[in-house]
Curated annotation (Swiss-Prot):
Catalyzes the first step in hexosamine metabolism, converting fructose-6P into glucosamine-6P using glutamine as a nitrogen source. It comes from Haemophilus ducreyi (strain 35000HP / ATCC 700724). This is Glutamine--fructose-6-phosphate aminotransferase [isomerizing]. GO terms for biological process: carbohydrate metabolic process; fructose 6-phosphate metabolic process; protein N-linked glycosylation; UDP-N-acetylglucosamine metabolic process. GO terms for cellular component: cytosol. Residues 2-218 form the Glutamine amidotransferase type-2 domain. The gene is glmS. It holds the Pfam family GATase_6. It comes from the Bacteria. SUPFAM superfamilies: N-terminal nucleophile aminohydrolases (Ntn hydrolases) (SSF56235), SIS domain (SSF53697). PROSITE patterns: GATASE_TYPE_2, SIS. CDD domains: GFAT, SIS_GlmS_GlmD_1, SIS_GlmS_GlmD_2. NCBIfam families: glmS, PRK00331.1. Its main location: cytoplasm. GO terms for molecular function: carbohydrate derivative binding; glutamine-fructose-6-phosphate transaminase (isomerizing) activity.
Length: 610
């Protein structure tokens, strides 16, 4: 959600900090700020509401200069978006930036006010600044003051602290919110995402839960929760240099929609061998665990939850294994029964989703045989804390509304289904080879769906004045309808809901009139006749129908509603295929509405707070 960048260098860091914030804009934010400290102990703090560009102009105008600094993009949780609530926050000579939520901030605020501290903002972060300032009065160092302060905090935090009296040092602390140290030569860095630091380093170490670190120009010292000096492995970052380049595309989301054929191809690479799923390529020793699985529990949020809902159909139909899918924020707060030989699967693009991480940590104490994650970021907390990981190969996804991460998650889930089905003897060699062939054809089939971009753009004009939309689907196309409704509401701000088509007469039919667009996913399959009956129910009440189907479904001759007739694809991969034209529909509607497609209001790319 929020973004953090910090630097200690022998050169001016103002440009480094601002560049880092620009690289984190995709995560979502409503305000931004920097604090820069020079060797003459002069600290400059500048904060602005709105885009990082406004902050950049202010930094240039104020001639901000110094070798140590911290910067932040804020997504409001406590206190409205305003300059006074933007980070960095200051207490005396202490400046602080923070990601996360301090759950006991109100109690701490009362104590600090009794000590004479005056609060300038309405944020929870300001208590950290005052706590550190208080502890520094008796501590021997900034490191000791931060260590004493953070043990008083309850909740999630990734925080970076700077002291005006110590202009060549930063102290950072992590609990529940990711932080990564970047190593340079005569300079070192800190950020909430390694992408922020790609212009200055490719050597990274990821802090673990409870770590506190002291960063200077020439050294990094890391201490665990017990205060013991520890080392964290330094990784050589292997990131896409051109991920931030939109190229010929107007938006990152559009670029990422069109990247899906190659993203799926990359996700399949190495995972198929001699016409079968290469189980060892899923994860080393995965076969030993997967062969014993008798139940699947999927936990995820948002788009990833919708991917899990599709996979439930596959697990039960292909692998003949029971599967539950839960929203992570619900799963972690209820009493659940763990089935024997049950595998927990978490799904997340970023691997830092707070509720999903919390659910994983709870589940690991609850008797699951193993915890697996399907994730797009190899260095993420979910990957590090799971027993094994099955990585999507979507590449960096910058648009807040997920596209290629969703379709590559589905690709991994289908591969996993086939692997379990074979290991448990529930899938014949011929059946496995047929599914594998369907997956191998999928990238080129999605390319054929992208050809319909102009036709879908024309269709989107009908939605220019609409405030509501319904999406309908049956079977595994119901969660595809759910995902399509989510995309539309995320980026166009149209109120969109999805229903299992058979539920129409149980309530949603009351909403149908001549002003209500109804989008139906209706390829030819065993449920098509049922879907056609639901379409007739909408037609009879004058609803505006938009049907996405294939030639075999027989909608070409229809004159009283609009259709996008797509090429036929194999049934098993059809849910992935139909996702793509529906993504295009949401994208073009958002363009007509004039919204911020890549950074929709109130939303963040990585939801790192609960």
């Amino acid at each position: 959600m929020c973004g953090i960048v910090g630097a200690v260098a022998q050169r001016d860091v103002a440009d480094i900090l601002v560049d880092g914030l620009h690289r984190l804009e995709y995560r979502g934010y409503d305000s931004a700020g920097v604090a820069v400290l020079n060797e003459q102990h002069h600290m400059q703090i500048i904060r602005r509401v709105g885009k990082v560009k406004a902050l950049e102009e202010a930094v240039i105008g104020e001639k901000v200069f110094g070798g140590t600094g911290i910067a932040h993009t804020r997504w409001a949780t406590h206190g409205e978006p305003s300059e006074i609530n933007a980070h960095p926050h200051r207490s005396g000579k202490i400046a602080v930036v923070h990601n996360g939520i301090i759950e006991n901030y109100e109690a701490l605020k009362v104590v600090l006010q009794q000590r004479g501290y005056i609060f300038a903002s309405h944020t929870d972060t300001e208590v950290i600044a005052h706590l550190v300032e208080w502890e520094l009065r008796t501590a021997h160092s900034l490191l000791e003051a931060v260590q004493k302060a953070v043990v008083q905090l309850r909740g999630a935090y990734g925080t970076v602290v700077m002291n005006q009296d110590d202009p060549t040092r930063l102290v950072v602390a992590r609990s529940g919110s990711p932080l990564v140290i970047g190593y340079g030569i005569g300079e070192n860095f800190i950020a909430s995402d390694p992408l922020a630091l790609l212009s200055v380093t490719h050597r990274f170490a990821y802090l673990e839960e409870g770590d506190v670190a002291e960063i200077t120009r020439h050294a990094v010292a890391i201490y665990n929760q017990a205060g013991e000096a520890v080392t964290r492995e330094i990784h050589q970052g292997n990131f896409e240099q051109d991920a931030a380049d939109k190229g010929v595309y107007r938006h990152y989301m559009q670029k990422e929609i069109f990247e899906q054929p190659i993203a799926i191809m990359n996700t399949l690479a190495g995972r198929i061998k001699d016409g079968q799923v290469n189980i060892e390529a899923i994860a080393p020793n995965a076969a030993d665990i997967l062969a014993k699985v008798e139940h699947i529990q999927i936990v995820a949020c948002g788009t990833s939850y919708n991917a899990g809902m599709v996979a439930r159909y596959w697990f039960e139909e292909i692998a003949n294994i029971s599967c539950n899918v839960e929203i992570a924020s619900e799963f972690r707060y209820r009493k659940f029964v763990v089935q024997p030989n049950s595998l927990l699967i978490t799904l997340s693009q970023s691997g830092e989703t707070a509720d999903t991480l919390a659910a994983l940590r709870l589940a690991k104490q609850s008797g699951y045989m193993a915890a697996m994650t399907i994730c797009n970021v190899a260095s993420s907390s979910l990957v590090r804390e799971s027993d094994f990981a099955f990585m999507t190969k979507a590449g960096i996804e910058i648009g807040v509304a997920s596209t290629k991460a969703f379709t590559t998650q589905l690709t991994c889930l289908l591969l996993l289904n086939v692997a379990i089905g074979r290991l448990k003897g529930r899938l014949s060699v011929a059946q496995e080879q047929q599914i594998v062939q369907s997956l191998q054809k999928l990238p080129s089939q999605i390319e054929s769906a992208l050809v319909f971009d102009k036709a879908i753009e024309k269709l989107s004009e009908d939605f220019a004045d609409k405030q509501h939309t319904l999406f309908l689907g049956r079977g595994e196309f119901y969660p595809i309808a759910m995902e399509s409704a989510l995309k539309l509401k995320e980026i166009s701000y149209i109120h969109a809901e999805a229903y299992a088509a058979g539920e129409l007469k149980h309530g949603p039919l009351a909403l149908i009139d001549s002003e209500m667009p109804v989008v139906v996913v209706a390829p030819e399959n065993d449920l098509l006749e049922k879907v056609k009956s639901n379409i007739e129910e909408v037609r009879a009440r004058g609803g505006q129908l938009y049907v996405f189907a294939d030639h075999e479904a027989g909608f070409e001759q229809t004159v009283d509603f609009k259709t996008i007739v797509l090429p036929r694809v194999d049934a098993v991969t059809a849910p992935i295929f139909y996702t793509v034209p529906l993504q295009l529909l949401s994208y073009h509607i958002a363009l007509i509405k004039g919204t911020d497609v890549d950074q929709p209001r109130n939303l963040a790319k990585a939801v790192t707070v609960e």
